[in-house]
């Protein structure tokens, strides 16, 4: 009888996990860079179709441009995001070297399924 209760509890746990939210659509919640900057590739479970970069208060103008091979480039302050066309699930995040002497933070917002995924990007001083 005790095994049945344990099995039922385990099954209930699996059902609750399966019905939960998609957890930022598989994209990382946070990415960190050292003061030297660099490049990181991140991906999610579902494709996104728009990217913007802002600070915590929503400030910052994302400049969009087109690169080679249909690459879209989004830049705001010290951070650049490159990705291939709409509905891609992979992006390249590039941080410039930090010469400010202060830790800095920006947020990458991706539109996924009429909702959004948010990636907090930090860089050490």
Please provide the spans of the model-predicted regions.
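Bacterial N-terminal signal peptides that target proteins for export
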Residues: 1-7
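Surface-exposed binding patches on compact interaction domains or structured appendages
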Residues: 46-92
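A short beta-strand micro-motif common to beta-rich folds, especially ectodomain repeats
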Residues: 100-114
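Post-signal peptide N-terminal segment of mature Sec-exported envelope proteins
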Residues: 28-46
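Short, hydrophobic beta-strand segments
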Residues: 91-99
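Bacterial signal peptide processing site
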Residues: 20-23
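C-terminal edge beta-strand
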Residues: 114-125
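C-terminal motif of bacterial Sec signal peptides marking the signal peptidase cleavage site
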Residues: 15-18
């Amino acid at each position: 009888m005790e095994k049945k209760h344990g099995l039922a509890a385990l099954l209930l746990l699996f059902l609750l996990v399966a019905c939960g939210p998609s957890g930022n659509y598989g994209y990382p919640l946070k990415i960190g860079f050292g003061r030297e900057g660099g490049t990181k590739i991140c991906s999610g479970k579902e494709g996104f179709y728009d990217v913007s970069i802002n600070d915590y208060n929503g400030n910052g103008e994302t400049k969009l441009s087109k690169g080679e091979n249909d690459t879209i480039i989004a830049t705001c302050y010290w951070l650049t995001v490159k990705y291939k066309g709409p509905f891609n699930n992979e992006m390249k995040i590039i941080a410039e070297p930090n010469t400010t002497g202060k830790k800095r933070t920006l947020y990458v917002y991706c539109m996924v399924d009429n909702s959004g995924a948010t990636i907090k990007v930090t860089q050490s001083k």
